[in-house]
Curated annotation (Swiss-Prot):
One of its GO terms (molecular function) is metal ion binding. Belongs to the ATP-dependent AMP-binding enzyme family. It catalyses: acetate + ATP + CoA = acetyl-CoA + AMP + diphosphate. It comes from Rhodopseudomonas palustris (strain BisA53). The gene is acsA. This is Acetyl-coenzyme A synthetase. Mg(2+) binds at V534, H536, V539. Gene3D superfamilies: 3.30.300.30, N-terminal domain of ligase-like. Keywords: Acetylation, ATP-binding, Ligase, Magnesium, Metal-binding, Nucleotide-binding. The keyword Zinc does not apply. It is an enzyme of class 6 (ligase).
Amino acid sequence: MSEKIYDVPAEWAKRAFVDDAKYQEMYARSVNDPNGFWKDEAQRVDWIKPFSVVENTSFAPGNVSIKWFEDGVLNVAANCIDRHLKDRADQVAIIWEGDDPSESRKITYRQLHDEVCKMANVLRNRNVQKGDRVTIYLPMIPEAAFAMLACARIGAIHSVVFGGFSPDSLAQRITDCASKVVITADEGLRGGRTVPLKANVDAALRKSSAVDWVVVVKRTGADVFMDDVRDFWYHEAAEMVTTECPVEPMHAEDPLFILYTSGSTGQPKGVLHTTGGYLVFASMTHQYVFDYHDGDVYWCTADVGWVTGHSYILYGPLANGATTLMFEGVPNYPTNSRFWEVIDKHQVNIFYTAPTAIRALMQGGDEPVTKTSRKSLRLLGSVGEPINPEAWEWYHRVVGEDRCPIVDTWWQTETGGILITPLPGATKLKPGSATRPFFGVVPQIMDADANVLEGECTGNLCLAKSWPGQMRTVYGDHARFEQTYFSAYPGKYFTGDGCRRDADGYYWITGRVDDVINVSGHRMGTAEVESSLVAHPQVSEAAVVGYPHDIKGQGIYAYVTLMTGVEPTEALRKELVAWVRKDIGPIASPDLIQFAPGLPKTRSGKIMRRILRKIAEDESSTLGDTSTLADPGVVSELVEHRQNKRHV
């Protein structure tokens, strides 16, 4: 474990919004006087009607309720666009960089206002009203931002679905929130290849009947099927509307968006975020964590289909009047230098990406990085999963030339924004550590018996107090919200992550402790992959676990028991990978499949995943007691035929 410490560079301590003394003072106030602290921070957004109540929250069993600024009224789009028009109408709001390096666009705040109003008017003309749900299934093109902000402008609730998800996954998400409209494109572009988005929507809507309209953005000009009644081209509808659209006044606790995330039960959870607290927290974390100053060019490489794209491409930066970069492509297309060429092309100052991308680029060596300048960079960030110290060191040394601090940020879809992180002018850095809690965040590490651990320790990470960006419920299923997050440790929010706290009080995230795996920074419920495998006619049973993967952080390891009489073959293995890929999406494709005559089960029939994890990690020497299994002999068979052998 790395214990190398990097001091705060002197110029950072001088220039940053927050140095160490200021961090200590602000953090103490945020936990000792949360009402006063958050009342002041909430002034960073414009309120149509000011709030009088700051916090009204309860984590109590059977009474979990989270409300912030509840009697205030505001509009997110007005805060992200309209209020900036007086002073920065001609400043670039969004730099769009296409998949093809020859395509890029700069959109000013004035242009953003006009485009968002057009999209909002198109939706209003189709009878989309406050509270209606709109599913957005778009590539990383400016229209994705326009669509999200248009929904916010008129009070519709957006549900963005990542373009890599399959028609079945899309249908599930459309049905769960009963979307009235789907906004999509003819096709997407990614790494030089096309993605059949409209065809996927057509397939999804054969399974989901709730949708009235499908709005289609022209991206590639491909010939796609258009239903005469249901489908229409966005560019044609946009010609018929004006560039003025009044904002809908929203209560702070009115929903802003639903974002589906994998759960351990297999049914994706609709994480619900509301308006006021979310925007305050996204704006505040973006300013302090990235030390965003006027004039900075900021680039978060995420997709808007994930929460990082919501909070740190769109809402946080635009609330702060920032210039934010939106990238359609991938890190290695057309070459491994693409990220660094984009940084030089647009003079990016702040760069926020995932450890998966860093590890993949690290494998390509230093030369694709060092052949570019990167002189504009002053801060690097990491998000999505814990970053291993080796990748951190490479990122710091090669990409940042030992001059850019790294903010290694820990947070979740459910948290709305960053919760544990260094602040670049305040925090000494340890490679691999998320370091210290953000303002108002009270982490507690618990043992298996629900005792709070003090000092140096390892256990399960909980949060003792609410914060404004916290999710409010699982859409349509508050009982599941309480069960998932508040039942394991009553009175506390359980993150599902393991954590270590060191002697300096720094936090090190050790990974998921529930049945969710983190693949390339994206959460995938093992039950979802298992259900897909078992749906194959030749599979009788499946168990899925994570295992260490050099690039992705965690890979997907599947144990598959076949129907009687079915022979395990390489062709069947490939067929099962393709089956899951088609059913859920490429992100869920198993990396390793082990055909298993039987799975380790307790006498009550419960699969012992702990044992399967150890075998997948090639740690079979530490399996522990297997005598309680119904058939202990299964284990030696699995160990013998494991797919991930390092130790013979």
